[in-house]
Amino acid sequence: MPGGCSRGPAAGDGRLRLARLALVLLGWVSSSSSTSSASSSSSSAPFLASAASAQPPLPDQCPALCECSEAARTVKCVNRNLTEVPTDLPLYVRNLFLTGNQLAVLPAGAFARRPPLAELAALNLSGSRLDEVRGGAFEHLPSLRQLDLSHNPLAYLSPFAFSGSNASISAPSPLVELILNHIVPPDDKRQNRSFEGMVAAALVAGRALQGLHLLELASNHFLYLPRDVLAQLPSLRYLDLSNNSLVSLTYVSFRNLTHLESLHLEDNALKVLHNGTLAELQGLPHVRVFLDNNPWVCDCHMADMVTWLKQTGVVQGKDRLTCAFPEKMRNRVLLELNSADLDCDPILPPSLQTSYVFLGIVLALIGAIFLLVLYLNRKGIKKWMHNIRDACRDHMEGYHYRYEINADPRLTNLSSNSDV
């Protein structure tokens, strides 16, 4: 058995050497794999860093000269003398105030951004000295509900200002409230066009404002309302026309404003409301009309309106309405008037009026000719006046002389003896 004993130790040594070799190989593989993984990770790190740096920052920055509140979704750029709309508005903005600036012109796409300001719902541009609003100025604002352009002297308001640059293909405006108080420009900037007509064209173009609920047009010196100014506003509920210079509502129609709830006509120059207007107002199911501080003329033309006022519940504060003219009716309450109080001065027939006008012209012409003749003969007239004055003086001196003789008896006797 010695041979067996000799093979045992040799076999054990061989197995030990194999085990050591396996451990060496395993250590080399692990080290090489760790080295390669480390090198690969280190080589990929610059790529990840560059990719991270290539991504644009989140668009939540606040424009210079503005105040931002992400919690309130509000940006205020107030009284900063801005000459254009900031281009770096945050995407979260829902309420944007750009009041008290120097914008002058609002061009097409003034608020167009990529991505768009999809959350912007209320835009206030009042008092920013805007004198021109071009077509498509408010495009790409899909959520805009309230727009305030008050206190801007708008010499030019494009017909497509609210409907887009091409009204024939543009979608309806999302506007619900439009505030245009005191936008009348100075007389020297009206560019030979009717201000009332310009505003009306912007309201009806493309039927873009059919969803409008509130429209304020106060303090614009309107003398009249164009015939179709309200024709494309069927959803209107609140209409403010106060503090203008409206003399009559004869040409405008309220018939299609079936949802109208408040109509403000205070502080105008209305003298009377005629039957057509009265019937239209009475036909609106929910309306309340405010007519205070108008110079009502209480003559025979007021009879129908007085009767209507006594019967209707449409007019708010109707007991405060008083007469302004004629003088004898001043401060009389309209509801207290009777038909006998409302009379008119007799009107001359048109032919007789024409005759009187012609007679006045003839008399004025004769008077002008007479004055011209006097002026041309002023020297002769002056000489004639002097001659008359001298003749009168001689006559008066002779009269006084005879009076003195007759008044003295001695001179009278002497005169008699002289005659004898």
Curated annotation (Swiss-Prot):
Residues 35-355 are extracellular. Disulfide bonds join C62-C68, C66-C77, C298-C323, C300-C344. It comes from the Eukaryota. The modification Phosphoserine is found at S418. InterPro entries: Cys-rich_flank_reg_C, Leu-rich_rpt, Leu-rich_rpt_typical-subtyp, LRR_dom_sf, LRRNT, Wnt_signaling_inhibitor. Residues 53-91 form the LRRNT domain. It is found in: Cell membrane. LRR repeats lie at residues 92-113, 116-139, 141-163, 172-204, 209-232, 233-255, 256-275. The chain crosses the membrane at residues 356-376. GO terms for cellular component: plasma membrane. GO terms for biological process: negative regulation of canonical Wnt signaling pathway. Its main location: membrane. Glycans are attached at N81, N124, N275. Highly glycosylated. It is a single-pass type I membrane protein. May function as an inhibitor of Wnt/beta-catenin signaling by indirectly interacting with LRP6 and blocking Wnt3a-dependent LRP6 internalization. This is Trophoblast glycoprotein. It comes from Macaca fascicularis. The gene is TPBG.
